[in-house]
Amino acid sequence: PWDIAVNKFWIYAWAIAIAVFAALTLLNATRNAPAAGTQNDATRGPMFGALMDLLRRPGIVPVLIFILIFKLADASMGFMVKPFWVDSGFTATEIGLVSVNIGLGLSIAGGVAGGWYTDRKGIYRALWVLGLLQAVSNLGYALAAAVIPPAAVGNTLAFEHRALLYSASAVESFTGGLGTAAFLAFLMAIVDKQRAATEYALLSSVFALSRSFAGWASGFGAEAMGYSGYFFLTFFLAFPAYFLLPWVKAMLAHSESAHSNALPENKP
């Protein structure tokens, strides 16, 4: 039954979330290690030094969890988009043209628009505004999955069904670009400018973990609940990240302050 499938999905999701939280909390404990033990961080390689410096920041655990789950809703749906197109009877040509080629162009356009909005309104506001738009786009696919019948021999897709899925794909691609622009701006803003490349790689690795989980869980969720129910559920996966925004705001302020203090003073 659908309700049992939902319960199982959330049990697995919470189990993974708790495990990740426990691991991050354990890593964050290194912040309280004796100062003498931190003197050799730099001698253990740039990656290790960057990791230790990152984990000693105040409030880093909630921020790492935010990075982990901010695009979880988008990733969870993304893995099942192509199977949904196929099961709905769309041709490989349509999938390649609309979902891939046009979708890529709209994602780039969304990235440009998201970058403009982030620059005008600031990273913090862009994260929750553009992140919300990114989540709402999942409902378009949920609607399409509820309306479009499964493919069957002899059936021809109606024009309105094609138009509905084309529209859902366009909105999802564009808003995905919006959210990505704000998210990448956030990652670049909080890295230490002295080791930006290394810290950015570490933070990107944390983000990649959510895609790994989403790839595994998406097939189970879609099979258990159907495409429409699963796409609708992914909409709600976006909101846990919003509870962590206070820590995100504090981290942005801390990074901005640290960057300002590092700038050389202007001398007359």
PLM regions and their residue ranges:
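Intracellular juxtamembrane helix-capping segments at the cytosolic ends
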Residues: L178-D192
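Juxtamembrane intracellular "pre-TM" segments in multi-pass secondary transporters
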Residues: P1-I4, N32-P62
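Loop-to-transmembrane helix entry/capping segments in MFS-fold secondary transporters
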Residues: A92-T93, K193-L203
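Helix-to-loop junctions at the C-terminal end of transmembrane segments
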Residues: A109-I123, A222-E223
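C-terminal ends and interior cores of transmembrane alpha-helices
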Residues: L132-A158, P246
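Short amphipathic helix-loop junctions that connect adjacent transmembrane helices
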Residues: F79-G96
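Cytoplasmic membrane-interface "Motif A"-like loop-to-helix N-cap segments
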Residues: D119-L133
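Multi-pass alpha-helical transporter architecture, strongest
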Residues: L26-T30, Y230-P264
